[in-house]
UniProtKB/Swiss-Prot annotation:
GO terms for biological process: neuropeptide signaling pathway. The keyword Secreted applies. This is CAPA-Periviscerokinin-1. Keywords: Amidation, Neuropeptide, Secreted. GO terms for cellular component: extracellular region. It holds the Pfam family Periviscerokin. Its main location: secreted. The modification Valine amide is found at V11. It is found in: Secreted. Belongs to the periviscerokinin family. InterPro entries: Periviscerokinin (IPR013231).
Length: 11
């Protein structure tokens, strides 16, 4: 889910 990516953005 996109929300999951926003929760912990991997640099």
């Amino acid at each position: 889910e996109a929300a999951g990516l926003l929760a912990f953005p991997r640099v």
